[in-house]
Amino acid sequence: MSQKMAKEGPRLSKNQKFSEHFSIHCCPPFTFLNSKREIVDRKYSICKSGCFYQKKEEDWICCACQKTSRRATSPQRPKHQPAASPVVVRAPPAKPKSPLMPAKPRSPPRPAKPRSPSRTERQPRPRPEVRPPPAKQKPPQKSKQPARSSPLRGPGTSRGGSPTRAPRFW
């Protein structure tokens, strides 16, 4: 733990421009790794977040966590963590489901189940299509309101304004 902390440098401020200090080369995780999980292009390295920018020959900066770190063996450890964590998390829930469902040989019902939710998803889709027409009716109502207010203003001002209206209100 202490070794990793020592290798990682301070976080860069959001205002700092990466291009001014070092070249930016972002790559998705495992893009530049071969089957043996060895880095093919030494200009790239991988951190916990899955990507590094190159700062210097020995220093790297991550495009996600924005931490600088050295090439050492640290990039190899994070490679296993992101790949193993989702697999381990997904595997345990899958195992309890299989013993709970005694109908393992019945494969046809399983594909039918995903189809039924898709039908339920399709039903709400037409509903939003029906909603837009009422929205179109609202703008004409708004246009009527200013039309009503404008004639009221027009005659009031044309009648002389203050001298004519003053005796009426008083």
Swiss-Prot record:
Q: Pfam families attached here?
A: FYVE_2
- Segment Disordered: which positions? 69-170
Gene Ontology CC: one annotated term: mitochondrion
Task: List UniProt keywords, sorted A-Z.
Answer: Cytoplasm, Phosphoprotein, Repeat
What is the disulfide pattern of this chain?
A: none
Which residues are annotated with the PTM Phosphoserine? S85, S98, S107
UniProt signal peptide: none
Q: Where in the cell is it found?
A: Cytoplasm, Perinuclear region
Chain spans, region 3 X 9 AA approximate tandem repeats:
93-115
Return the sequence repeat spans: 93-101, 105-110, 111-115
Q: Where is the composition biased (Basic and acidic residues)?
A: 118-130
Stated name of the protein: Myelin-associated oligodendrocyte basic protein
